[in-house]
Amino acid sequence: MERIKLAEKIISTCREMNASGLNQGTSGNVSARYTGGMLITPSGIAYSKMTPDMIVFVDDKGKPEAGKIPSSEWLIHLACYKARPELNAVIHTHAVNSTAVAIHNHSIPAIHYMVAVSGTDHIPCIPYYTFGSPELADGVSKGIRESKSLLMQHHGMLAMDVTLEKTLWLAGETETLADLYIKCGGLHHDVPVLSEAEMTIVLEKFKTYGLKA
């Protein structure tokens, strides 16, 4: 895809993310794999004012193009692309329910078969590290190898998939599951979960399930 077209899709994803309630203000960030690196949202610019020329290219060694400042979380995005070469888009948000669960350092267990959208039988929560730090990038790298969506303790949520559209869908499903987990009382006591055997069946069925385009 041409750079300008991909940059436009990144911006439209950001705006849809905020409009749907998955994020607030400029706290989240979005990227897409691009030849030799990635395109990522810039630091501190409102999505309503963002234009394609503001989207920043960062090469696969972590060097941003001259004159532009990428999101403060560019390290976690780059770590994701290195960890999952088959996936092409990353969305990080401070979605309220996902963040609430993450503050308690809870993973989301198999409370509903839709947990399988993550590619595994739970949605993990990685330990807290300072935002923008190499330690956080390392934690995200380990977590994303296990699951396509994850929670970040005292921070937020991250999702990764093959396209921006699928990644936004995955982020939305993760937030819904976090909401269900809270409403089931999962922050304060054990909740019923599906068996490992059932989740194995569901995961197999999910190989052909989900957003098709």
Curated annotation (Swiss-Prot):
It is an enzyme of class 4 (lyase). Belongs to the aldolase class II family. This is 5-methylthioribulose-1-phosphate/5-deoxyribulose-1-phosphate aldolase. GO terms for molecular function: aldehyde-lyase activity; metal ion binding. It comes from Escherichia coli O45:K1 (strain S88 / ExPEC). Binds 1 cobalt ion per subunit. Can also use Mn(2+). One of its GO terms (biological process) is pentose catabolic process. The record marks Y113, F131, Y209 as: Plays a key role in the stabilization of the transition state and positioning the aldehyde component. Pfam families: Aldolase_II (PF00596). Its cofactor is Co(2+). Its EC number is 4.1.2.62. One of its GO terms (cellular component) is cytosol. It catalyses: 5-(methylsulfanyl)-D-ribulose 1-phosphate = 2-(methylsulfanyl)acetaldehyde + dihydroxyacetone phosphate; 5-deoxy-D-ribulose 1-phosphate = dihydroxyacetone phosphate + acetaldehyde. Keywords: Amino-acid biosynthesis, Cobalt, Lyase, Metal-binding, Methionine biosynthesis. Uses 5-methylthioribulose-1-phosphate to yield 2-(methylthio)acetaldehyde and dihydroxyacetone phosphate. Can also use 5-deoxyribulose 1-phosphate to yield acetaldehyde and dihydroxyacetone phosphate. Part of a bifunctional DHAP-shunt salvage pathway for SAM by-products. Disruption phenotype: Inactivation of the gene precludes growth of the strain with 5-deoxyribose. Pathway: Amino-acid biosynthesis; L-methionine biosynthesis via salvage pathway.
